[in-house]
């Protein structure tokens, strides 16, 4: 039986996600702050019409979201799939060229914030796009691919994904995986460990720490398993996509960041109908208490809509053969994801209540990512940066208010 038949009447996720009320001050803070999200929506999986993407990104711009790490490829996608996906995105964005800035450095993100355009930061959630050819990594850098996940859920030449590990197989990082990491480090592309099995991820972190000490790596969209494991609603084994405290602490040691996803089905056992600002704040707060405010980001991991996701899961059964975990979560109502434009201002109010300062939130919403971007993409470590990040943010904000007030 197809997964589509198992989930009748599946409705849009983020498109119909709840808009949460927020104070005027919080709404303005989001507009005044560089905010960098993350969405997991290749064409045909998340969005299927150009207007769909434009509407989503216009809502984000209106709310003050500066930019997004946008997923071009995942799972077992090939080089040819990557080229097709980039064409789909670029051709749609070419319809409104003034709305988009394609990011190769932090300066591009700052320019997008000043102008009120969308900063486009490409990512790939799989290394299978290389088609076995390491020389393609250099081309990825020129294309603006900012980060790469080695293995998505299942097993490939680099190692084992989180679902494979959940099902009992995680043999760790392979020589091919190490060879890819060498090329990522060589060309300044961030190693992303979300979707990766724990042993494979730990092996990758060991390799990075040994061969490239001081180069940060990240979990771009992963929830903390520890937030849910002791709750009454928790499932016996937890969600296979969530990470351990040990993994998060390793990222801190590298100087990287961890961003929680606002995806409802990964909120083990809770599986809300609509993720609340309080629940989103809980995710952020957990990581801040664990690894510190300098190593936490945000990543809605939005899919635009879950309808194509169900079809994708049906066509790629091995990637989602999880003992019905995801389907049980869907059946429980957790079919959505917190869309940043609809929830972030309310999350801001909640974090203010918990004692977070504006400086803290500026780091979490975008500053920590930009520090890692600058270090990996541009080779400028924080201690070697001639401009203090706070001074840099103030310069950007002054320019925005002078030339593009909103």
Enumerate the predicted regions with their spans.
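N-terminal hydrophobic targeting/anchoring segments and the immediately downstream early-domain regions
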Residues: 9-167, 186, 209, 217, ...
């Amino acid at each position: 039986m197809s997964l589509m038949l198992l989930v009748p009447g599946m409705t849009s996720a983020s498109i119909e996600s709840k808009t949460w009320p927020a104070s005027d001050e919080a709404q303005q803070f989001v507009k005044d702050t560089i905010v960098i999200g993350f969405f997991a929506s290749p064409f045909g999986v998340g969005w299927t019409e150009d207007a769909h993407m434009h509407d989503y990104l216009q809502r984000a711009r209106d709310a003050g979201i500066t930019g997004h790490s946008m997923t071009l490829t995942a799972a077992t996608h090939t080089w040819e799939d990557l080229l097709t996906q980039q064409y789909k995105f670029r051709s749609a964005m070419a319809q409104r060229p003034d709305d988009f800035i394609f990011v190769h450095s932090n300066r591009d993100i700052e320019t997008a914030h000043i102008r009120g355009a969308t900063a486009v930061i490409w990512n790939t959630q799989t290394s299978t796009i290389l088609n076995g050819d390491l020389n393609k990594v250099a081309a990825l850098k020129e294309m603006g691919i900012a980060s790469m996940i080695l293995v998505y859920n299942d097993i490939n030449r680099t190692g084992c994904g989180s679902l494979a590990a959940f099902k009992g197989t995680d043999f760790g990082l392979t020589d091919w995986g190490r060879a890819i990491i060498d090329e990522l480090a060589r060309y300044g592309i961030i190693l992303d460990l979300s979707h990766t099995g724990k042993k494979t991820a730990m092996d990758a972190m060991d390799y990075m720490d040994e061969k490239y000490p001081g180069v940060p790596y990240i979990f771009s969209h992963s929830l903390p398993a520890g937030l849910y494991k002791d709750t009454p609603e928790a499932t016996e084994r937890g969600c296979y996509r969530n990470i351990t405290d040990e993994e998060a602490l390793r990222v801190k040691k590298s100087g990287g960041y961890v961003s929680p996803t606002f995806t409802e089905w990964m909120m083990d056992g809770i599986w809300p109908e609509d993720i609340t600002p309080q629940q989103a704040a809980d995710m952020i707060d957990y990581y801040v208490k664990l690894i510190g405010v300098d190593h936490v980001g945000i990543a809605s991991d939005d899919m635009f809509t879950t309808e194509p996701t169900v079809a994708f899961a049906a066509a790629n059964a091995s990637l989602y053969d999880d003992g019905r975990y995801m389907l049980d979560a869907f059946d429980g109502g957790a079919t959505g994801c917190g869309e940043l434009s609809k929830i972030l201002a309310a999350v801001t109010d909640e974090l203010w209540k918990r004692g977070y300062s504006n400086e803290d939130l500026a780091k979490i919403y975008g500053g920590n990512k930009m520090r890692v971007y600058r270090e990996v993409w541009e080779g400028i470590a924080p201690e070697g940066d001639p401009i203090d990040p706070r001074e840099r943010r103030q310069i950007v904000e002054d320019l925005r208010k002078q030339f593009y007030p909103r």
